[in-house]
């Protein structure tokens, strides 16, 4: 049976798939979301949390494009915390523990409420390809779904294999079959495939934990939502427990490490560097006498606890033994053993910046299939792939997230230009311009682009336009309120007596002054600003000097990406560059700096070194040419 009439088909109902389907539908594409089971849409397969350092920035950017993750997390969040709250705004990371059930139900409700989006239950087995481009999807039961654009968001399901000690079980996650047919399809297309792995800890019965003997970590007093559309958090907040592994824990693990699937040679996939198993921690950091374990409740009406920090692939009986040596867990009962899962992924260098496969028009990939790890990274790719699939289906130009204006752009550029050798995770350190790419200004950076693209709903557009007007009016007011140095000193603002008038905005750029200090000088004028607007302007003004410099640097980078490299450029003479990079650049012979930047292994530091050398060399050549002309 053939179904016609879809513009976009999304395969997979996880974090990438839900954002992809929603994004495509918001652009007006008739969209089908294909999933094994409707009730698994939005399932949190691993840890019950959203956001964090770098990751929280991605959630805010998804929200700025009118995506779903931020709003759903605000409904399901049961412990909101702003990480790095005491540090600068650029590195603060919004995060929440989430109730798994609430999150899944809220995401399903959001998908079901999206106009133009159908949910189709079943197993996508193969792609329908016609004249060198995607024509639809072939289901395992023989159904054919037709569409000019398909987004694959298969997560860990591509030839997924779960490991618990020596036991191996084909699965995409516990209790769900892997996807074998699509993996074969990708290999048949000639795409470069690799094998990665991730892992998860045992799930514990919270009723058997001695909560009195562990530390506690609660939510912040001031709960900061993810979404621009959320006015306040109303879900009840809970505490997490905090404990540590012991020498006895380590002894059991080390004595039995040969039984770990990771260390027995049974697993061929590469694991995530920044989310190591407890076995990895002991091998790499054996000198430590303990490792922190966060006991994270999985829901308000669920006694299951996720012990974050002890991911493992040891046999179940050894897991039970080492868990009982951790303070507070002496009597803990395991509900589900921890496990490692390995799966196929596609080399993301097979993709364009729109996440379309170069070898097959109309096929887009998003999420762990591209070598990333994490809900937020997957969701951000799903957003980009869904938008571009919808644009392709209407013969429109693709939309590319820029590296200079979004963390989504940083991630996609990293993936498509450099590829991955291990699961990719977002950090603020990956962005060259993180003072500009803050979590607090994601809406100001991206919502105007989303509105121009047409993927923002009327309510958000109206609220954002009003907010932007408030910001502009507030900024103008701050710049109009000025005082002389003597007037400032009389008001308690200690500045140099240099005769120059300074505005309220100028004072906010100084680290010693904030709105509280300025309201003593201008109580009536500044008292009218909403707290959210005042906070945004305070951060903006505080960074203003640096942002001006960074804006210039961004413009410089865009120019430098077009800078030509001489065909006979001698990379071996470039001191400070590794021998490996010298060899790769000499072999690739990039035409310009933009091409050099995507050579495998190139880092921002290496690009900067190349630019300095080229500027110096080309400046010398211009100077020599000028000297020759003068002598003539």
From Swiss-Prot:
GO (cellular component) term, any one: cytosol
Entry's Gene Ontology molecular function annotations: flavin adenine dinucleotide binding
Keyword Cytoplasm carried by entry: yes
Entry coiled-coil feature ranges: none
Annotated residues for binding of NAD(+): 271-285
Keywords of this entry: Cytoplasm, FAD, Flavoprotein, NAD, tRNA processing
Pfam families documented for this protein: GIDA, GIDA_C_1st, SAM_GIDA_C
Cofactor: FAD
Signal sequence coordinates: none
GO biological process: tRNA methylation; tRNA wobble uridine modification
Subcellular localization(s) per the UniProt record: Cytoplasm
Binding sites annotated in the UniProt record for FAD: 12-17
PROSITE patterns for this protein: GIDA_1, GIDA_2
Function noted in UniProt: NAD-binding protein involved in the addition of a carboxymethylaminomethyl (cmnm) group at the wobble position (U34) of certain tRNAs, forming tRNA-cmnm(5)s(2)U34.
Family from the record: Belongs to the MnmG family.
Complexes and interactors: Homodimer. Heterotetramer of two MnmE and two MnmG subunits.
NCBIfam families: mnmG_gidA
Protein name: tRNA uridine 5-carboxymethylaminomethyl modification enzyme MnmG
Organism: Rhizobium etli (strain ATCC 51251 / DSM 11541 / JCM 21823 / NBRC 15573 / CFN 42)
Origin organism lineage: Bacteria, Pseudomonadati, Pseudomonadota, Alphaproteobacteria, Hyphomicrobiales
């Amino acid at each position: 049976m053939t179904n016609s009439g879809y513009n976009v088909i999304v395969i997979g109902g996880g974090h990438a798939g839900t954002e992809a389907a929603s994004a495509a539908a918001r652009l007006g594409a008739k969209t089908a979301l294909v999933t094994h089971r409707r009730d698994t849409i939005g399932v949190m397969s691993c840890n019950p949390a959203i956001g964090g350092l770098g990751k929280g920035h991605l959630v805010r950017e998804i929200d700025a494009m009118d995506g779903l993750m931020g709003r759903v997390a605000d409904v399901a969040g049961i412990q909101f915390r702003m990480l790095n709250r005491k540090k600068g705004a650029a590195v603060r990371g919004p995060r929440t523990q989430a109730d798994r059930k609430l999150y899944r139900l809220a995401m399903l409700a959001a998908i079901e409420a999206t106009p133009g989006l159908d949910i189709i239950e079943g197993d996508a087995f193969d792609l329908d390809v016609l004249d060198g481009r995607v024509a639809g999807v072939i289901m395992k039961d023989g159904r054919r779904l037709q569409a000019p654009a398909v987004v694959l968001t298969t997560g860990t399901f591509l030839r997924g294999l779960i490991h618990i000690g020596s036991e191996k079980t084909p699965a995409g996650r516990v209790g769900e079959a892997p996807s074998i047919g699509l993996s074969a399809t990708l290999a048949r297309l000639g795409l470069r495939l690799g094998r990665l792995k991730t892992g998860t800890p045992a799930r514990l019965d919270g009723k058997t934990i001695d909560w009195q003997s562990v530390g506690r970590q609660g939510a912040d007093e001031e709960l900061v939502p993810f979404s621009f559309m959320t006015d306040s958090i109303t879900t009840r907040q809970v505490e997490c427990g905090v404990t540590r592994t012991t020498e006895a824990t380590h002894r059991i693990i080390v004595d039995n490490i040969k039984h770990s699937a990771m260390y027995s040679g049974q697993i061929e996939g590469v694991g995530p560097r920044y989310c190591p198993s407890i076995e990895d921690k002991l091998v790499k950091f054996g000198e430590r006498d303990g490792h922190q374990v966060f006991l994270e409740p999985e829901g308000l009406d669920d006694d299951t606890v996720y012990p974050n920090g002890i991911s493992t692939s040891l046999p179940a009986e050894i897991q039970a033994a080492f868990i009982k040596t951790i303070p507070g867990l002496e009597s803990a009962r395991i509900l589900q053993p921890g496990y490692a899962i390995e799966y196929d992924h596609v080399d993301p260098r097979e993709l364009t910046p729109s996440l379309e496969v170069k070898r097959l028009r109309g096929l887009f990939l998003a999420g762990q299939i591209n070598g990333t790890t994490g809900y937020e990274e997957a969701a951000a790719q799903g957003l980009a792939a869904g938008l571009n699939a919808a644009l392709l289906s209407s013969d429109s130009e693709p939309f590319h997230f820029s590296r200079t204006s979004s963390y989504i752009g940083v991630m996609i550029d990293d993936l498509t230009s450099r590829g991955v050798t291990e699961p990719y995770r977002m950090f603020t350190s990956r962005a060259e311009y993180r003072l500009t790419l803050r979590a607090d200004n994601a809406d100001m950076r991206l919502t105007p682009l989303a509105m121009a693209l047409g993927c923002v709903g009327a309510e958000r557009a109206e609220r954002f336009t009003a907010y932007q007007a408030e910001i502009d009016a507030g900024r103008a007011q701050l710049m109009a309120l000025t005082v002389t140095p003597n007037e400032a000193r009389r008001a308690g603002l200690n500045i140099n007596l240099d005769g120059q008038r300074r505005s309220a905005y100028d004072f906010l750029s100084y680290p010693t002054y904030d709105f509280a200090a300025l309201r003593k000088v201008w109580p009536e004028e500044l008292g009218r600003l909403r707290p959210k607007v005042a906070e945004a302007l305070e951060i903006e003004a505080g960074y203003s000097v640096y942002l001006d410099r960074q804006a210039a640097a961004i413009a410089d980078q865009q120019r430098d990406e077009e800078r030509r490299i001489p065909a006979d450029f001698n990379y071996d003479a470039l001191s400070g560059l590794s021998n490996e990079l010298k060899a790769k650049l000499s072999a690739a012979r990039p035409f310009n700096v933009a091409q050099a930047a995507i050579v495998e292994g190139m880092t921002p530091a290496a690009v900067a070194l190349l630019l300095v050398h080229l500027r110096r060399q080309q400046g010398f050549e211009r100077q020599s040419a000028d000297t020759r002309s003068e002598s003539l």
